[in-house]
Amino acid sequence: MLAKMIDKIVSLKETKIFEIDGQTYADASLTRIPPHVDRPDCISVSGLDSICKLIRTELEKVGTTIMVQVKSNDTVEVMTTYLSDFSRNTLYRAKADAPGLRTGFRGREVALIELRSLCIPNEGTAYLLDLLSRMTNENSVSTNDNGVTQTVEARQGVALNAVVDIKPRVMLRPFRTFLEVEQPESEFLLRVDPDEGIGFFEADGGIWKLEAKKNIADYFLKNMGDLIDAGKVVVMQ
């Protein structure tokens, strides 16, 4: 009797599989079991040129329309259009090796190095390099900030050799997107603090990211125009 009860309990716990309209279900909660589909591994690269070469090399093998999505200022993903099961294959992904310019405060020497190594030279970098080159380390400091300009008479920490009106905003072009496209120029808020040092803060609300995405999309339009016109490649922002 006990053995029959155990057999009954075991049979009740056994999962039964049903085929309904070509789909596979389990009897517990009728959860769909998706079929296994062999998919290619996503290839990761760091440049837009590599994406173009991969698409041209493997387009015929893919056998369907390819979607190029500019996801952000430093990321591009390439995927197929809908397959027969309404899924997509992510084929390639590009991530820019762009250091960018960290927002926040840093020391004078670090600021000098970052302006020379992380930014494309322009009027903004020339102004900042000249300003920083006239700073010294002394024993006291006084500041006057009216919200438009900041005046620093510096004699301690980050210090100036004279009373100078500091521009509150400067235009900089840090390396923030793929090197194959133009680096966007944007406003940065400049702050000088006797204790914290030199501060750079983005001041354009992220508009530069939209410009970077447009530059990336334009790169693909220029380098894969024939495939785009033929409807084989679609570029999205």
Where on the chain are the PLM-derived regions?
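The transition from N-terminal targeting/processing segments to the mature protein
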Residues: 108, 121-125
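Membrane-active amphipathic alpha-helices enriched in small hydrophobic residues
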Residues: 124-139
